[in-house]
């Protein structure tokens, strides 16, 4: 038998030591005893007793030996020891999958497998020792933190501490990607703070709380950690194998995670996102995350598999269950206190429009409570941008926008979802980790004033979450898919040649370069005709572009049935052009008024910001004005030109590159206009569902009549935010002048649509002139 690779550092000193050895097989007993002999050979004066580590579930009577050892001397050290079985190097995907089967876990080989390992590769058997602690220190910690009452309770506590110490030692060997919490349920249930809070909930019992903790538990194992990348790759097999990272961001995040626990808040466009985050952490050898997911995804084999991969399933509706809310809050607090990382979508659900949704505060409130309660010196909110060249889910989103129903999750749905991933090449996945947001910076020090001031705390949470979302937006790279889709949506079904596409896209690329906006490699390749051809061909066959190549040269366009799918991609890039689009519309508005045009320009820019605030993220008012001034500064003496006559503004718009408001924002104001039109004869207090149904009907009529530019405006998703707009404008609640104010609002939207038409006219005339010169 070859010599095992044992850890023989002198962890046993001359002090009186109790060695708690976890050894269940003859091979493990022999390895541990050999290790102890080596310890004695290195230090002949050491004094120690060896006791087999009791099982956590043993009856109190079985703990007698440990109780006696702990009572013998308060100053003696306790050192936990066990054999760590390393898995074989370079295991295949199949071997990793087999590791979940009974008797195949490489980290816990059976007796026969252990003998085989010692004969063939004994270096995989490593004796490890956890950090030591004095009995007196353990006893004090036990008294301070648990509800234990007798020596048997203390012995069970020491057993748990020993197991956790050995887990930490093994994690240091394997790497941070294997770090995961252990013994969460017994640790929480035994804690003094948990029991104290439980007593304040009427009718709450430890047994019921334990069941809820079981429901939240992940069942994480090292074998399942190895499987994370395999599962993630299976779900994303339609994408290129290499995820696109910013290595500088990864390095910065690695340093930050070494200092504080973090909550990774990711943008959410696809079910794949929940798999991408764990894969990204593992590929970059970063600590794993516990991803929160709705319990609706815990079905069939999906539930156990995801749990073992670190997913925490939570109930959707918990408002009327104080015990569940308390258990969830304490669970989150325990995780961050032990410096493990959590993750969920900051938007709370998938964005079916491609835009960032407003942040949800629910789970974040629990994390803030844990921080303010002093369970961590700081907690980092790590923004995570996840974006894709293409998604197969756009077809589902388009159907939903047209009024269809959401497909319920289940076995059939899962099969279809996984099957769809292999139907074609969806391009690349992009993951970005912008600078983390410090909870301490926004909430102040733990135990501060926000503990008592709930209104101030909520405001701070809102500002903090919006900052996270803003950093996600700023870090998300613009893709070729988004730019091409935005361009072809403006033609309203008219096909463009390769040269037309290439020439028109250059203005947008120039703008992005000037603004130093992050762009993908596919977007950079749009500088060449070959790059444009690759981009439109990748989207052809109705995904969402159609190519016609039966004539002299191929042309590309978007059919009416694919407008909603194309809009999903276009919407992902609007944030990069939002303020420059508002400049165009404010200029066009000032062009059509008499009087102080500068005053009108600024008033309209702020008004557009107010109307669009439910669809897009904006900087605060002062920063927004500064950004607008920067955007319009492309023209020297712009203040004088805006204050001049209409011809000066025309000249400014003619020289602006790009003119893009029509491509980016028209559809949203058309949706608002449809809702405002429906409101003319809708009753007061009309509900969102009823108003949406009416708007869908009227919108389809207007598309047929050509009164709106495309069917893209007729969308349940856009009407949902349009409803928020009219509520914000006080156009729903009963009032004596309600009908009049509804008409005024509708006229305002018609004026804005006129401004779109004016900008589009200039852009179209410029396009025609360029085409004429090129022939």
Swiss-Prot record:
GO terms for cellular component: plasma membrane. Transmembrane segments: none annotated. Coiled coil: none annotated. This is Glycerol-3-phosphate acyltransferase. It comes from the Bacteria. The HXXXXD motif is essential for acyltransferase activity and may constitute the binding site for the phosphate moiety of the glycerol-3-phosphate. Belongs to the GPAT/DAPAT family. Pathway: Phospholipid metabolism; CDP-diacylglycerol biosynthesis; CDP-diacylglycerol from sn-glycerol 3-phosphate: step 1/3. One of its GO terms (molecular function) is glycerol-3-phosphate O-acyltransferase activity. It catalyses: sn-glycerol 3-phosphate + an acyl-CoA = a 1-acyl-sn-glycero-3-phosphate + CoA. PANTHER family: DIHYDROXYACETONE PHOSPHATE ACYLTRANSFERASE, GLYCEROL-3-PHOSPHATE ACYLTRANSFERASE. It comes from Mycobacterium leprae (strain TN). A motif (HXXXXD motif) lies at residues 268-273. Its EC number is 2.3.1.15. One of its GO terms (biological process) is CDP-diacylglycerol biosynthetic process. Keywords: Acyltransferase, Cell membrane, Lipid biosynthesis, Lipid metabolism, Membrane, Phospholipid biosynthesis, Phospholipid metabolism, Transferase. It is a peripheral membrane protein. It is found in: Cell membrane.
